[in-house]
A protein has these predicted regions:
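Short alpha-helix in the alpha/beta-hydrolase fold that links the catalytic acid
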Residues: 50, 183-190
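Short, solvent-exposed loop/turn elements at domain surfaces
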Residues: 3, 182-183, 210-211
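Post-His helix in hydrolase/transferase enzymes
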Residues: 211-225
Length: 245
């Protein structure tokens, strides 16, 4: 009963590979599995449209992970993510996965990759409105420990500034000039000399609209496709701005 609000995690994510969604015949047959990670006080339903978009364009393994906001430590959420990735790899026969994370979900994915050895399993991380440098949101929201970990002065954010030599995972950070929960808005960009990261600016997309906007979904599909066969290159790059309002 509490699961739909995100207060309790699911015991087992649904088998989204069996979704009643028509797949296109030729595209994406070799794509790694995609894991979708929602944001704070949300649940996997935030990714209904994106999951459908990926399946329709040929992705075969798309799984949305529910986790509980009662989890008070992002590090524990990252551990849970690691266990789920191992389960997905075992079930699908793939050796690596791609991750799309909205807000807190993106920060959890990045922490797993950078600080817990997840680069060995994660090919690509796409983040949507994720506070990579921390966000100065309303102080009242900081009553929750995991929200405090998303503030600029938190130990988690400081850990993510540490060197990450040899990290092979490719990052795409989508950030919007209209993201009301990212303060300042460019905190959703990745700035790290050791990471192979590309920042993708958007115009006119609010925080909650990022995982459901059709044009953003197209950009995510393109990012996941571009990552195939790409050679690891450290350093941050900037994409041209895109208006999707």
């Amino acid at each position: 009963m509490l699961y739909p609000s995100g207060v309790l995690a699911e015991a087992k994510p649904p088998d989204t590979e069996q979704a009643d969604t028509k797949q296109l015949p030729t595209e994406g047959r070799s794509h790694p599995p995609v894991l979708l990670l929602h944001g704070f006080i949300d649940n996997r339903s935030a990714f209904v449209l994106l999951r459908r978009s990926l399946l329709r364009h040929g992705w075969r393994h798309v799984t949305a992970l529910n986790y509980s906001p009662l989890t008070c430590d992002l590090r524990r959420a990252a551990e849970q993510l690691g266990r789920h990735i191992e389960e997905v790899c075992t079930r699908t026969g793939h050796r690596e996965v791609d991750i799309v994370g909205h807000s807190l979900g993106g920060l959890t994915a990045r922490y797993y990759v950078q600080r817990m050895g997840g680069a060995a399993r994660v090919r690509t991380v796409v983040t949507l409105g994720t506070p990579h440098s921390g966000t100065r949101i309303a102080p009242a929201l900081s009553a929750h420990p995991i929200v405090r970990q998303m503030r600029p002065d938190s130990d988690v954010i400081k850990e993510l500034t540490l060197p990450a030599p040899g990290c092979r995972t490719r990052f795409f950070a989508f950030w919007s000039d209209l993201d009301e929960l990212m303060v300042p808005v460019d905190t959703a960009r990745i700035e790290h000399q050791d990471l192979n990261a590309q920042n993708v600016p958007l115009k006119g997309v609010g925080h909650l609209a990022l995982p459901v906007h059709g044009a953003v979904a197209a950009g995510i599909r393109q990012a996941l496709t571009d990552a195939e066969g790409a050679q690891p290159t450290a350093g941050t790059r900037e994409s041209g701005g895109a208006s999707v309002a």
